[in-house]
Structures are given as structure tokens and as C-alpha cells.
């Protein structure tokens, strides 16, 4: 989970995986299952692995990056939806 602890907001965050096509589908399924189990919320609470993005501009930047990926033929297979019930800067991993 190279991006969960910092909500993807540091320069060493995992951005891409290069995976052989023979294992890509299985790896994708396993990663999606793992990310769907990430506890999101107040990072000061025990058991929470992912907190909010730093500010609303960071959320807008993330949404724009996801839209650019889609516009260029990419598929978002997990996450990327806002979580307003947690606060204005929470987004699914």
C-alpha cells in the first residue's frame, strides 16, 4: 500500500506498477480487494489507515487526474469517489 498512509500525497508514493500481462488480472483483483478494506477516517483514531487529502484543491487535482486518465483510455478499477460523509477532503483509495 505505497500510497495509503499518506493518502497519496508524498513524492515517493507509488504511481505505477509494471506487471507482466500473465498476472495482471489476478494482481488487479487482489489489489482492488485489499484497497476496498482500507479503513478511512480520522488518522488519529486507532485502526484508521487512511485520512483525508490535505485540502480541497488536492481533491480537485486528484479528480482532474482521474478524469484525464479516463479521457486517455484509462480505467479506474477502484476508488476515486469522494466521501462527503467523512468530510470534504476524503476520497476513496
Model-derived regions, located:
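ALDH superfamily catalytic-core signature
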Residues: 1-93
Amino acid at each position: 500500500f505505497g500510497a495509503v498512509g499518506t493518502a497519496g500525497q508524498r513524492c515517493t508514493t507509488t504511481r505505477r506498477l509494471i506487471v507482466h500481462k500473465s498476472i495482471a488480472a489476478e494482481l488487479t483483483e487482489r489489489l482492488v480487494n485489499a484497497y476496498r478494506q482500507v479503513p478511512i477516517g480520522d488518522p488519529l483514531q486507532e485502526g484508521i489507515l487512511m485520512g483525508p487529502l490535505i485540502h480541497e484543491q488536492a481533491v480537485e487535482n486528484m479528480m482532474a487526474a482521474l478524469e484525464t486518465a479516463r479521457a486517455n483510455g484509462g480505467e479506474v478499477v477502484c476508488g476515486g469517489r469522494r466521501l462527503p460523509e467523512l468530510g470534504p477532503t476524503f476520497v476513496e483509495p
